[in-house]
Amino acid sequence: VTYDSLCINGPEYLLHLARQVRNHGIVIRRHRLSSLDEAYDLYSHIDILVNATGLGSKALLGVEDETLFPAKGQTVLVRAPNVKTCYNHRLGWGTDIRRYIIPRPGPEGHVICGGSYNVDDYAPFADPKVAERILQDAYELCPDLSIGRGWENIEVVSHQVGHRPMRKGGMRLELETRRLGQTGSTSNALRPGPQRRNRKQVTCVHAYGIGPAG
């Protein structure tokens, strides 16, 4: 099956979106949180909180969702300016492993080759054997990656590793009304004193465990 579509440069597009929201006066702040309650201390008033922490919701106090688990994915970024076509091929029925080639728009001539799917693998580093298999599969689909000179001659730029936020039973999309500090002794004990006294009712939308969609 072939069709015409669009392809975007993911990192550049995210930077573009960040610039757009900042241009509209929206402030982007980064914080490391250990509990859901801490998020309500960042501003004097919050109408609604969206918990989209992915795998972080497994350890986030106040959520601690034990049904979350990772599915490690690995890709290889290569340089092949002559490759302009995307490829996507499932490695047999009943498997979640696909081999794919995605040219990344931009002057660098970069192409993304993938992929892998390893359940319950928390390792943050790239597996050389998986990388080799990815390059071999990619070359089989598109010899132009090295202008027909073999997979060993594909110009590798970098290796990427990510962990898909999988969840038993599917994603969680839920509106929760809760009171600060209601989540039990462990969460409550770790809350700073002044904020723990604030037990106001708050609203949170949980949106995580989206799995292969990231």
Model-found features: residue ranges?
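Helical element adjacent to the flavin cofactor pocket in flavoenzyme catalytic cores
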Residues: 2-34, 40-48, 52, 57-59
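Generic recognition of long tandem-repeat/solenoid scaffolds
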Residues: 2-3, 113, 204-207
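Short, flexible beta-strand-to-coil junctions
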Residues: 4-6, 105-106, 210-211
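Aromatic-acidic/polar surface patches that form glycan- and anion
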Residues: 6, 10, 127, 131, ...
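Flavin-dependent oxidoreductases
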Residues: 36-136, 140-158
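C-terminal catalytic lobe of FAD-dependent flavoproteins
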Residues: 148-214
